[in-house]
Amino acid sequence: MPNIAILNQETIDKIAAGEVVERPCSVVKELVENAIDAGSTAITVEIKEGGISFIRITDNGCGIERDQVAVAFYRHSTSKIRSAEDLLTVKSLGFRGEALSSISAVARVELITKTYDELTGTRYVIEGSKELSNEEIGAPDGTTFIVKDLFYNVPARRKFLKTAQTEGSYISDMVEKLALSHPDISFKFINNNQTKLHTSGNGNRKDIIYHIFGREISSSLLEVKHECEYFKVEGFIGKPVITRGNRNYENYFINGRYVKSNILSRAIEEAYKSFLMQHQYPFTVLYFTFFSELDVNVHPTKMELRFDNNNEIYVELCDTIYAILAHKEMIPEVPVDSTPAPKKIVHEYKEPIPEPFEKRRINEVRAAESRSVYGQSVTATVKSSTVKGPAVNEPLTENTLNQQKVKTSASTPVVHTGNSVEPKPETSTAYEPAHVVTGTQQTLGDYDKVFLTESAKKQFSIIGQLFKTYWLIEFEDKLYIIDQHAAHEKVLYEKTMARLANKDFTSQRISPPIVMTLDARECEMLEKYRPQIEQFGYEVEHFGGKEYMISAIPDNLFNIDMKDLFIEMLDDFSNATGRQTPDIITEKVASMSCKAAVKGNDKLTLPEINKLIDELLSLDNPYNCPHGRPTIISMSKYEIEKKFKRIV
């Protein structure tokens, strides 16, 4: 048996450093957090070659007293806490006392520091945990750390670092997170002698978001401000149009610390679920202050936390974010194509160029128009449809949209559903430029006229149906386009989910019943999830052996192959390894609603589309179908006139 021996201090330090210093980004994080704890108002981060060869952190904080400099590099030496009880209430970013010891064990470190009260500063040099110099030096107030040749004495660790460009991008991302966490501190980031980021430190969180993420995101934000018995949260979330395919744009800060939290992420993603496409994630910059005790001593990076009351925090945060999203009208606006027109190439010809045929034809048309008699009123006669449909005032049953496929005349008139205000004649073709945000979701203020309201519906002007799928509606100075399939799918989905929540799902008997033969796995899933299946409105009875009989089906889902849908449901339950049952139910309701909804190319009548709009009005979130596609988009009068070059 090998002898058991105590490791020497150098080996211990290198092993400990491996937990704290994973890459150059870790060095920057630890040193900048120390600078923040020192009360700095300006911090400069400079790196070269991705921070592998050179890192310099400069701050104007309180500095380190001369007799404390060497002690600061001992393991577990800190000014942040004094006992284990302090871990639950610690407010500083650092507290373990391991950072300087770990960094100096695997790099060449130079420290220059001066306190406000001292006349001169201190220069301290340490390499591989060995002190090389400790001397007085002239220096400004604050602290400067210079870290060179990271992992110079641990070649195995250095070998596994990525390229300088990749390591530099990690540092850039970390500096951005630190700048977001403390908008009252001016951050400057220099990479290979080029300034990549410089914030003002004016405390304005939206300014920081603009500096880091740009105008598109900063102009599409919703403010969050909420306080409850568990926490206080402030900051911004992105409108549903701002999404990413990963969680890189989810930023959470707790008591000034950038953290990654599954509880917070899941709560916010649940709130966004009905507003986003599948596998898309929102943009968030949220600042939390928790009133209960927190455990930040979970991971050496201090980026993970534990809460006392996970469930309460989850529910409160999810409800808060959903309320903000649900009470804003966010209809995607079609952007104007900003691609500049190609420049015309002008050729010189010595002989006169013959007048193009197209120009002559246009001139002839204009001449013919000028000879027209405008005094006579021309009325278009519309042939009434011979197909019988429900009258406008006739109440529609819930399944009207599904059971009636009414063919109407090809020439659909413009129908006004209320007392629409006729537009005033234009007195001039000159238009004042308006401020337009293109490619975003327009959030209307409290005093703007909202599209999906009862009062607004009285002023709708339904123009007609386009491609037998989209309904065109004029309101105020915008054209709204409703996707009849997505809208009906959303209505069915919300009705089904409401019935599930209230446990009042009703069924309709079918004759003859559907008889199916299930295999062993399907039988197991049926018995395991029978309560959930019966909640949908199915009535399933054992018919002997592997035979099962469906005698009743959900009463609000029509025109669906119920046998295939039932088998598909059992397959989904079978494939849902490790997933929450409510998530499976939600997805299945969305699938059922999609299949039962009116399809594209289905001709709807005016009463039917009015019924559909009325049902949309009753929803908290009528803007997206269950899969995240928009139900309504809009195009402003300004944008249409821009397309026709009436506005240049």
Curated annotation (Swiss-Prot):
GO cellular component: mismatch repair complex
Gene3D superfamilies xrefs: 3.30.230.10, Histidine kinase-like ATPase, C-terminal domain, MutL, C-terminal domain, dimerisation subdomain, MutL, C-terminal domain, regulatory subdomain
Coiled-coil zones: none
Matches recorded under CDD domains: HATPase_MutL-MLH-PMS-like, MutL_Trans
Disulfide bonds: none
Xref: InterPro entries: DNA_mismatch_repair_CS, DNA_mismatch_repair_MutL, DNA_mismatch_S5_2-like, HATPase_C_sf, MutL/Mlh/PMS, MutL/Mlh/Pms-like, MutL_C, MutL_C_dimsub
Compositional bias annotation for Polar residues: 396-430
GO MF annotations, alphabetized: ATP binding; ATP hydrolysis activity; ATP-dependent DNA damage sensor activity; mismatched DNA binding
Keyword Secreted: no
Residue numbers spanned by region Disordered: 385-430
GO process terms (BP): mismatch repair
Record keyword Transcription present: no
Keyword set, alphabetical order: DNA damage, DNA repair
Superkingdom assignment: Bacteria
General function of this protein: This protein is involved in the repair of mismatches in DNA. It is required for dam-dependent methyl-directed DNA mismatch repair. May act as a 'molecular matchmaker', a protein that promotes the formation of a stable complex between two or more DNA-binding proteins in an ATP-dependent manner without itself being part of a final effector complex.
NCBIfam families: mutl (TIGR00585)
Family: Belongs to the DNA mismatch repair MutL/HexB family.
Name recorded for this polypeptide: DNA mismatch repair protein MutL
The species this protein was found in: Agathobacter rectalis (strain ATCC 33656 / DSM 3377 / JCM 17463 / KCTC 5835 / VPI 0990)
Gene name linked to the record: mutL
